[in-house]
Swiss-Prot record:
It is an enzyme of class 2 (transferase). This is Probable thymidylate kinase. ATP binds at G9, I10, D11, G12, V13, G14, K15, S16. It comes from Methanopyrus kandleri (strain AV19 / DSM 6324 / JCM 9639 / NBRC 100938). One of its GO terms (cellular component) is cytoplasm.
């Protein structure tokens, strides 16, 4: 099985563009890449219009499980996802759902090896949501990331992206993915020499 990587962040940070660029860069390096976008099913897309964060969380979790069930993790060197279960924790808790309940709901969901969180100030012109709500979601990402690292075997990597363009962010992800694929055990270079 290859790497399962997720790209996260508030609306408007450029997740979709970064995922597309990173996939393109990885393919240039000869890697087999499968991209995933959440939500991807009718129920997941429909849930975007609902007002109840608990119902949304249930729908997004179903969407996620159905989407990931279709992914052949064995055939890809890298599975790159535009959003992961972390989105449900951040967004639905910002809308009022209990974070612990959301965490338990995600327990059976396949987990990425690494989640890259693109972090920058919300820009009102970029997003579907107002700036105040996105700032609340941004704070919930921090809380959710701490819980996830405690509860699951998922590494969280923050990308401070205030002064970075999408290509630079994608290049960081690609470099990290290639390093992990070349050295899956994470053995420091100095231990491998001599």
């Amino acid at each position: 099985m290859g790497l399962y990587l997720g790209v996260e962040g508030i609306d408007g940070v450029g997740k979709s563009s970064v995922v597309n660029l990173a996939a393109e860069f990885l393919e240039i390096h000869g890697l087999e890449v499968t991209t995933v976008r959440e939500p991807s099913t009718d129920i997941g897309r429909e849930a975007l219009e609902w007002d109840d964060p608990y119902l949304q969380a249930l729908a997004f979790t179903l969407d996620r499980m159905l989407t990931l069930k279709r992914v052949d993790f064995e055939a890809a060197d890298v599975v790159l996802s535009d959003r992961t279960f972390l989105s449900t924790l951040a967004y639905q808790s910002a809308l009022g759902a209990d974070m612990r309940w959301l965490l338990e709901l995600q327990r059976p969901v396949p987990k990425p090896d690494v989640v890259y969180i693109i972090d920058r100030e919300p820009l009102a012109e970029d997003a579907t949501f107002d700036k105040e709500f996105l700032e609340r979601v941004r704070n919930r990402y921090r809380e959710a990331a701490r819980l996830i690292e405690e509860e699951f075997d998922v590494e969280i990597k923050w990308i401070e992206a205030e002064d970075m363009d999408k290509e630079e962010i994608a290049e960081l992800i690609v470099a990290d993915a290639r390093r992990r694929l070349d050295d899956p055990l994470g053995i420091p270079d100095d231990l491998l020499e001599g």
